[in-house]
């Protein structure tokens, strides 16, 4: 579960390393895998596409909290991670690192195709 003021890792090569959740879209109190959130970059790679302190949108791809699959099994990741997206919902980076939970929304198919492993 991702709430406001949650520190998250970035799972793509957009240039951001760590981000802070500053808002949730849809009027929710918490976000899970596949939800879109508003983030602020806290630490960056100097050669990246993003700037420190700027506000971006991101989609949650991994959460520490257990997520049940349709067959009854449970998936739990070791970190909370996001992929930065633009206003059209396309990822800012060209690669996605680490495993990604299957995103049910059809608008994030590009993220699933860039991922190494989809669970």
UniProtKB/Swiss-Prot annotation:
Pfam families: Ribosomal_L14 (PF00238). GO terms for biological process: translation. Keywords: Ribonucleoprotein, Ribosomal protein, RNA-binding, rRNA-binding. GO terms for molecular function: large ribosomal subunit rRNA binding; structural constituent of ribosome. CDD domains: Ribosomal_uL14. Part of the 50S ribosomal subunit. Forms a cluster with proteins L3 and L19. In the 70S ribosome, L14 and L19 interact and together make contacts with the 16S rRNA in bridges B5 and B8. Belongs to the universal ribosomal protein uL14 family. PANTHER family: 50S/60S RIBOSOMAL PROTEIN L14/L23 (PTHR11761), LARGE RIBOSOMAL SUBUNIT PROTEIN UL14M (PTHR11761:SF3). Binds to 23S rRNA. Forms part of two intersubunit bridges in the 70S ribosome. This is Large ribosomal subunit protein uL14. It comes from Wolbachia pipientis subsp. Culex pipiens (strain wPip).
